[in-house]
């Protein structure tokens, strides 16, 4: 099977894992006035890409992807636990668990994942999103770069959807913003594949946004 179909499937916002319900702190950044327009939105997204995702989140996922594809279940366990421990707030932890569980349910209902992958996924209680994403890559025969690029695109598309629902930002403006971010996305993905997985991150702004979102008066999103 052509891997482009599997990559598009994994990257799609139509993947039934509930990503549209979450903003990953962006809604709180909007409420606090840190993000006000397309320019400040771009600054927020580039900071997330360069300072958080490319340096910690994505290298950790890349390591988990490589371990899953190789069938190194001990390494999968270690990477999955690091990912679980790195969720700094209740909302971010719940988001990862809910989306991971939904992707697990999807993979269990489809024929592609092998017995070893199913057995490992079943031992997670429940799997976080990174763990389930790695098993989806194993099921659909995607290498680490393909699965990681799908993850980056899924993240960007979700963030743009949040902005279109919360800012005076139309579809054309969102596509212009996406065009301006593609080189940053490319660099972040390449950097993540080069970097070793590290033990922790220091995305204080994201953590603060997520914490304040828990008590935000009016919310559209669950994170």
Curated annotation (Swiss-Prot):
Gene3D superfamilies: Urease accessory protein UreF
Entry-linked InterPro entries: UreF (IPR002639), UreF_sf (IPR038277)
Compartments reported by the entry: Cytoplasm
Domain of life: Bacteria
Keyword Cytoplasm appears in the UniProt entry: yes
Subunit structure: UreD, UreF and UreG form a complex that acts as a GTP-hydrolysis-dependent molecular chaperone, activating the urease apoprotein by helping to assemble the nickel containing metallocenter of UreC. The UreE protein probably delivers the nickel.
Described purpose of this protein according to its UniProt entry: Required for maturation of urease via the functional incorporation of the urease nickel metallocenter.
PANTHER family xrefs: UREASE ACCESSORY PROTEIN F
HAMAP family cross-referenced by the UniProt entry: UreF (MF_01385)
Protein name: Urease accessory protein UreF
